[in-house]
């Protein structure tokens, strides 16, 4: 069978657990992603099984003889290095970035600090711990401003604020999901996203997707549960803009130490067409509305082959030492 244009020995993949569901605020989306991945792998003849860490102990993976895991978990405990660390201890290879890269990428503030240090463009921001500090951030960054939890995804807990009065409620909402609240400069312009596949020097960007949401509001509902959002792939952007985005996202991916696959979100500022990195998702959605499969289709890679190729890239952070025998 083929994945990413290469031949893959399905039997060599062994017994596979598709990790789905979990305990995060993104459980519903994860169940949809995992169900799609499971069907795709089964269609290739992979010995794949659904496994929900919210309902079963991860230690059962070893007891039941699983050889590798496809992580279709999103958000806390699945995308933040937690499950990756458990799988490292169990010695079971898994898809996506490793422990440190997953943990850093889940923390938007830490990610932005690293990107800025490396000279990568990202919107200005403030870390706040109260509604009062949120108001002060609005004065510093200007309106409108984005207020969101530092460690959530799928726009959960996110608010776009225009006035000081809106800051209080926005802070309360974001802090329900994370004590660390990020206030971020709003970039007016084109919203785009770009997947990256591969590892190290082999990492490469897939085609850019341009997103046009109703009234510019690409929220949780418009991401997953409506058909009102329009996705353009090919993006329709000038060739030099697309090339620059692809170059930046590969740098962003490598800078955080990612491997396997991820997807970066970028805004292109309307005033000067400068791209700004917003965040990187280390376990992107794989639902019917998801963007990595859409980008892959644009270069002739089917959903089924995409899933197989990602699974084949499963790895551990470090080689497992041989067990010593008494």
From Swiss-Prot:
Entry's cofactor comment: Binds 2 magnesium or manganese ions per subunit.
Superkingdom of the source species: Bacteria
Keywords on record: ATP-binding, Cell shape, Cell wall biogenesis/degradation, Cytoplasm, Ligase, Magnesium, Manganese, Metal-binding, Nucleotide-binding, Peptidoglycan synthesis
Annotated binding of Mg(2+) 1, by residue: 265, 279
Location in the cell: Cytoplasm
Task of the protein: Cell wall formation.
Protein name: D-alanine--D-alanine ligase
Species name: Delftia acidovorans (strain DSM 14801 / SPH-1)
